[in-house]
């Protein structure tokens, strides 16, 4: 482990020497090229994952079962559903869709980048001397608070997709009447043999957290959109203040 840390220290030193020549760039000047690229990839992959998740959550054609359609109309986009011959007595058989697999893959990729950045930035924040004491406090507090929030939501979302298996939740109409939990985030309400889905408390919490994190990361995506250039960002900020 010490050899790995020594090697990372050597790499970081070289990166900072190069970055010092480009000090006008906001992220690159502080964290180096590798961490900046990983951070950008994380923001991008998480943003796409979160938007896809919200599209699936707010999909209007949700779980619907009644005497008229004798089947299932839509299923969130997350899963593929196999319609049984006897809809009211047979099990619902469904598997994760390509849409769900894409979210699952992006979520795992985002989680990997978050863990990687947490380790890399721990070295930069607590071992390196290129940043001041107050920068260390601000960056460490803000970043590791973000790490907990992001990882918690990604873990919830991954569990939601993985636990769609029949073994975890009931799959017949008889069972759904006594146990309305269709999945980790959704419950089933029924009236006169018409079944419809609603977000449960955990699903509502996960959705609210997802929206909050997306809004939180928008300013950071904006900084990357301006090429991380401090002078350009400062000029825009000063122009707005004068107006």
Swiss-Prot record:
The keyword Transmembrane helix appears for this protein: yes
Residue ranges of the TM segments: 38-58, 99-119, 143-163, 204-224
Subcellular location: Cell membrane
CC per GO annotation: plasma membrane
Keywords: Cell membrane, Membrane, Transmembrane, Transmembrane helix
Principal cellular location given in the protein's record: membrane
Keyword presence, Magnesium: no
Membrane topology category: Multi-pass membrane protein
Protein name, as recorded: Uncharacterized protein MG323.1 homolog
Taxonomic source organism: Mycoplasma pneumoniae (strain ATCC 29342 / M129 / Subtype 1) (Mycoplasmoides pneumoniae)
